[in-house]
Amino acid sequence: IGKSVPLVDANWKMTGQAQYGDDIRLPGELIGKILRSPHHYAKIKSIDTSIAEAMDGVFAVATGQDSVNKFGVLPVTKDEHAMAQETVRHVGDLVACVCAIDEATAIDAMNSILVEYEVLESIHDMEDGLKDSEHPIHDRGKYHIGESNVQKRVFQQFGDLDSMAAAPYSHEADWETAGLHHGFTEPHAVVAHWDPSGRVTVWSP
């Protein structure tokens, strides 16, 4: 505390020597690619993967129906899926994935998947998203409060809140800020290896 600490991996990153998941190459590896939604909000009417499945060099094709188990980025709320089940909720939502012998084959297979959508009215204004809705974008689970499109509200409490009453100054206000992605240097990729004993090694990002 109170001292400048050298960033131990700065030189590796600045000189391009840092190793990320996408730099890892394993013997006999397979390449996966993900098909993503071009729509903000839509129902998935059908997915035809037959062309991709019949292609030489394609080992597997999967959709949301193959990944029905739920998880939670916030572990207390396990209400998310690895891929869209019946509805896509943003541009880039995961629809299907392929596993192939190389990247070119995986991309060709991914692009051959035919998806029929029913495009729904999307919300692009925060104030509109807070209004009550008969048809919420997200399923209403036990953490969904009220009738709005707020996906979930989780209340957590930290510190001594009572001490704020004795604070000499206080300020309350509303703030708005745009979504901001961190300035990453690594590609979004992951490499996994299962050895004969069943041990899994994962390189990410």
Task: Please give the residue ranges for each predicted region.
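Structural alpha/beta core scaffold segments of enzyme domains
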Residues: 1-205
